[in-house]
Amino acid sequence: MSSYFVNPLFSKYKGGESLEPAYYDCRFPQSVGRSHALVYGPGGSAPGFQHASHHVQDFFHHGTSGISNSGYQQNPCSLSCHGDASKFYGYEALPRQSLYGAQQEASVVQYPDCKSSANTNSSEGQGHLNQNSSPSLMFPWMRPHAPGRRSGRQTYSRYQTLELEKEFLFNPYLTRKRRIEVSHALGLTERQVKIWFQNRRMKWKKENNKDKLPGARDEEKVEEEGNEEEEKEEEEKEENKD
C-alpha cells in the first residue's frame, strides 16, 4: 500500500517537500501536534512513521535561540521553522507579515488624502458646532436683566415668614423706620417687606370679611406717609443719576 501511494508521488516532490500543500496559515505546524508524523529521511529513503517528540524539542530549542525580537514583532501570527530544514519537511518558511499597527500606518501613508480629508472634516464639524452654539441674534428679552422681563417671584424662607408673621401680629402696619430694621434683620429689601405686609393684610381681610383692620386709620396714614417719603427719595436718586 505504501509503495502504491507514496512511490508515484515521490518522483513528483523533491526531498524536503511534503505530501500536503505548504500554504498553511496557522501558528504551529499541524504534524507537530500529532503523536506520529510521516517524514522522509535525509537521503531520500522510504518514508516511515517516527515519533515527533524529539522533533518538537528540537523545534522549540532552535526556535527560542534563533528568533529575534524584530522577527517576533514583524511576524506575530505565523511561526516559521528555524533550524535544520530536513527535520521539518513540507513546512516552508511563510512570508513574514507586519503588525496591525504597521499595516495601519502603511495604509495611512499609502492614502494620505484620506487622513487629510478626515482632519478637514473634523475641523469643519467643530467650526459648525461653534457657530450653532453661539446665538447670532440677541433680543432684549433674552437678556437676564432686560427691562421688559418680569422678575421671578420672591420666595421666603421659613424663618423669614415666621418673623414677618410675628411682626404682623404685633403691628399690621410698619413705619418706614421699622421696615428698614426688619429688612436688615431678615436679609430682605424694604420693597419685599412692604409687599409681604400688603399681601398679608389682603389675606386677613378676605379671611375676616372686613374692609379694614380694627384701629388701622392712624396706622394707614403713617404708612402712607412713609411710602410717600420713600417715593420722593427714589425720585431724587433718579434725578441725581441723570
From Swiss-Prot:
Listed PROSITE patterns: ANTENNAPEDIA, HOMEOBOX_1, HOMEOBOX_2
Polar residues composition-biased segments: 116-136
Molecular function (Gene Ontology), one example: sequence-specific double-stranded DNA binding
Role noted for this protein: Sequence-specific transcription factor which is part of a developmental regulatory system that provides cells with specific positional identities on the anterior-posterior axis.
Gene Ontology BP term (one): anterior/posterior pattern specification
Biased composition regions of type Acidic residues, renumbered to the chain: 221-242
Predominant location: nucleus
Keyword match Cytoplasm: no
Designated name of the protein: Homeobox protein Hox-C8
Similarity field: Belongs to the Antp homeobox family.
SMART domains: HOX
Biased composition (Basic and acidic residues): 206-220
DNA bind region: 149-208
Organism: Mus musculus
Domain of life, source organism: Eukaryota
